[in-house]
């Protein structure tokens, strides 16, 4: 081992450590925000939003488990040829590489499933403009039905997990400069993944993760336009200004949620660049999953802010009326005293 190798390895370990810290910040925040949202959905949802809240709940549960799995995995990509190899720095390594791989599959399936729920949310907002809101049971059935492709994705993708020792040999052959087989340097390194991205199971999983987003976003843009057209009075739908304002607020929230997957696009770009060996820096190896983990952390914040009952309840928790009243009264007294004070 020469000085150049030592410097390279030291640099890689420092970068890995920085991204581990980022993962330990982003994922717990996501767990906190989604837990808050789930509690508010369960306790503060008004009757008129009961059925729609099932979509929020589906989102929140999906994001919550995605953050939990991401925190346990803390994976980075180290592609070697056409093999999809991942190094896991999280606590999952204390159990087994197979468990780490399952967490990887689970995170991917959560992120893919969230796209379907987002599309259904837009379809729902358009549907109820001139139709009776479907009951909660029907919404739950729709959520279960749209989850089936993602469940199949988990089964297919998980079935193609490769032998850990075989993957370690491949990684060491493609990246000998990092000496990944040295326990003195890396400890008990946990590696999992797939032998080839061209195998039927893995390739179909990659297709499911990437291709459906294009037609899904096409549907989202189309129905967003139709919904806003109706709300602006250009459609034939008549409603009160309060109802119209409520619809617009929820559509605004959904529109911002539809922008959040830019993280997905950015992460996928880095992922493909690494896969096709266009770039191979340690930073790029760590970036895709840290970027993707920002999505389930940000999404609940949008619902917490734009859905008025949840925002009001959250404000009441952190700024109780009993605490605000003395402050407001004091401010009013000060203002009154200043206005009646004699002018010198």
From Swiss-Prot:
It is a multi-pass membrane protein. GO terms for cellular component: membrane. InterPro entries: 7TM_GPCR_serpentine_rcpt_Srd, GPCR_Rhodpsn_7TM, Nematode_rcpt-like_delta. It is found in: Membrane. Its main location: membrane. Gene3D superfamilies: Rhodopsin 7-helix transmembrane proteins. The chain crosses the membrane at residues 21-41, 54-74, 102-122, 142-162, 203-223, 259-279, 287-307. Disulfide bonds: none annotated. Pfam families: 7TM_GPCR_Srd. This is Serpentine receptor class delta-3. Belongs to the nematode receptor-like protein srd family. Keywords: Membrane, Transmembrane, Transmembrane helix.
